[in-house]
């Protein structure tokens, strides 16, 4: 009798484990179907993917292949500490590998890497299903919905968050394996692997990574409690978990320690050391956005922007106070997963099954968090450590989609494993629930006067829902037909996601739009800048450029081409630089070109000091600077996209001056008042002596200029001050004739070093590790 039961259970486990190989093949085929427009080069991932993340990769690759350090870049914001910036990709292993093997990564290679990470995450979930003995049909649903549903598809341009999400899936699989295999001799290896991958996830240092850590904690605790309850021996189970979980915690902590220290140090120096509750609440997900679970293009998300009527469109919804792009409000996971969650999960109890309770709790957490100010929960969650570092609770939809994908897959597993054939009464109830969800869309469209506009999308969604519901009713009848259910799921869900979450204005645009970002670009503006920068180069010069109000993707083009841009595109900027110059996170349109009291116009000491020689603007410069006077700038070229101006007053990058004067930099930033001195002969310092005779004139020339080291040859018969018009940062060090010298903050935001008589050489070197240690110990300047 016992042997018969054992044989039966083995057959059940074998049946549940069978089909995973074909499921993987179907998943990869579905992935190819979905990704082909990008992989073929017909379209490319636009917006932040190209405007921000691709230039970061291009800079990383260029630096590595030139034998330079990528830890600092002079190409944006007057200089920026890449090693501490979460979005620099320096601590993203797949991007580092691509940069090592390809000096100039193509758009296709960059996009392929993004999708490869999502495919990796999908495969990890399939491995999780196989480990747990869940059926391949459910694994296929989970993998497809995870990789190409919800925010993974609609926000694929947010590359860092997509990478964090992908690592989350792998970490989840390894964590569950470490807990399940706790009694095996090498369980600690799996725990260490889980910690390593969780650490890689957290290296993203974005909100998805932070929420992913919370989700892993909830799911890990749930699985551990489940194991304790199943075994009955709580103490023994908990003792067995110490090694794998301890190993994971140790490895994870080692992985993240140094990068986290750098980023926290940069945050303290930045324009956004913390986010206020009000600032974060503006990134809440509007409750109406949940209707896109039912109908992907319900609000016209993938059409022209003028036709979009979903939140936070003020013309339709009134003033919401939200700051979200339209694609951030789309959470479509596929009709089949939605029907599975509603019918098999909610009505048939799948979501409350023992294996799913932790997933349900984690999903509820993410849903409430994403809704932000629309529920009281976010006010409580905002007190969690780290919550005030992020500004958009709607980012939780990344994790919500991943959790829903697993939950939907589990519900499909139960459908086949338990042969859950629906009675007529149950079918009527399930059809009613799906109809109610669909009716909510219809009523909303009618209420907002958009029913006619939404009708085509609603009709398509109705068809996908009906087919998916019918499939789940009929599929259990095909249990004995080998691969028929798998093939049906693969075809239905893959084509659904391709049709509804496929290329659109938010996720796919022609690559020709981004020609200026190619390392070998043949763009008129890039060509003109290359020519003029070469012509104006001198022994003491390294002229800066401004790329303002040309287009969304232009501000970080300097990272690709090696231009020194005093602006850029990055939400994280050095506070003293942003305050002094007015630089904000972007300069894609005219009203983002902000002037500050200290940099009040193009004809200003700040513009001249930074060596701003070439100014490129989309509209005429006078549209950006209302105080521009004739002769302030000289128009030197016009292209179809831009005007190119020369500032003839731009200073060289290095100057040797003979006089110093004390100045209150905070007061200067606030009032915009410059002392009445000749800045070619005098340097402003915060702690200069009250009286100082002028030194005899000298000279300076740049001997070598690299990302993290600048060598300058000087002739200083009576000494003086060498001014380097690069942004000051406490992690830079200076040497004069090979001996350490004090690096001074000069002229509000730049660098200087005092020279003794007869000095011959000065070296400025970026020393982030020593600088970080000094900052932690309270010894930073």
Regions picked out by a protein language model, each given a short descriptive name:
Residues 3, 10-84, 108, 261-271, ...:
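Hydrophobic alpha-helical membrane-insertion signals
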Residues 30-125, 144-169, 279-335, 370-380, ...:
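Membrane-interface coil-to-helix junctions
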Residues 53, 556, 567, 636, ...:
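Active-site-proximal, structured, solvent-exposed surfaces of multi-pass membrane proteins
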Residues 125-148, 185-188, 425-426:
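Transmembrane-helix signature of polytopic, membrane-embedded enzymes
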Residues 141-153, 193-201, 395:
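Short aromatic/hydrophobic helix-turn
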Residues 148, 152, 199-208, 253-255, ...:
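Transmembrane helix irregularities
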Residues 158-166, 174-197, 208-209, 213-241, ...:
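Contiguous transmembrane helix-bundle modules in multi-pass membrane proteins
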Residues 486-610, 639, 644-692, 729, ...:
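Extracytoplasmic/lumenal acceptor-recognition loop(s) of multi-pass membrane glycoenzymes
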